[in-house]
């Protein structure tokens, strides 16, 4: 059982345990020890998003890592996938991201990438925790010239912009395309506009003035209504919204209608099937994806493999099965041929390339998938108790599942990063499943709800 790490690294309110400077330094020391192999100089990349607390945690991590005799390459604000890319391209021993993704500014987090740019498996995170709580490394104190150094990589943004542009087909450009872009006042506020503009698009930017406290504040992928209204106002071709660390992306079409991750996966999977580029004709998605995605991919000659929720589990399944496309309904998209993790800007470029190649609007491409009605309700809880051990709740869920039969499903799971129970229902009748979802939520609230 992990004590610090959740589904996406260590996360919490900044300056409150476990997201304190003291713990960040300990995490840095443990990680530096773990990633050292052989008698040579080692290097770890550190990047962050635009949160105020990023400075505090960055310095603590740098101090911890250097105190173990490992050098640090500091890249500053950069999208999470950009940090993974820089880690791999600079042949560093590991990468560290300081970000809480789509969470509000007061939260922050720490997560790691291995030297090849992939997120760490659970066993590596457990080893970091063991080194911290066992005290095994407390007495290890390199001295004199063995202490690590910190270097700032000033051209990290430029390096990543070049990488992203190189992922776009050389025979295509975005000339004549008007794009509304919301960077959530987050890590992509420089990168994303630069990439789209250099490829020829007219960019109408939102969320590109971070001040440390406005990341994800009424903007970004959690607030698609912002780009929806802007697309209609500016008569743009589409809208693109990233989250705070730019590892996920949500679109709206030319009419302002949201196009979620499931639709994007359907668009990309069917296009790759046509081009015979989808490995093993298989798309990897999570259990949260709409059943309409399975139907669309099957109709195009492919299949969908499902995993637990979390882009790390999608990537693990992709590596294990030898697949090259995966993602989540929330907007995490993983293209393993050019990248190693979810990348909002790269995913947007893949969709834009498909639009250009097919000479179709986003609304036309999105017609490839017809989603089943789906309802998602979040209930804040005081404890993450196994739902099957609450008789009344388990009985109610069982009764509703019988009524749904083969024409729908219920998925109940706890958030890996927040004290929330997520209740998702899918079925043919939106009104009916909305009522059932509320019925379950009300009962859960009564039994284990928390303010």
UniProtKB/Swiss-Prot annotation:
Cofactor note: Binds 1 Mg(2+) ion per subunit.
Classification via Gene3D superfamilies: Alpha-D-Glucose-1,6-Bisphosphate, subunit A, domain 3 (3.40.120.10), Alpha-D-phosphohexomutase, C-terminal domain (3.30.310.50)
The UniProt record lists the keyword Magnesium: yes
GO biological-process terms attached to the record: carbohydrate metabolic process; peptidoglycan biosynthetic process; UDP-N-acetylglucosamine biosynthetic process
Single Gene Ontology MF annotation: phosphomannomutase activity
Job description of the protein: Catalyzes the conversion of glucosamine-6-phosphate to glucosamine-1-phosphate.
Protein name: Phosphoglucosamine mutase
Taxon lineage: Bacteria, Pseudomonadati, Thermodesulfobacteriota, Desulfuromonadia, Geobacterales
Gene: glmM
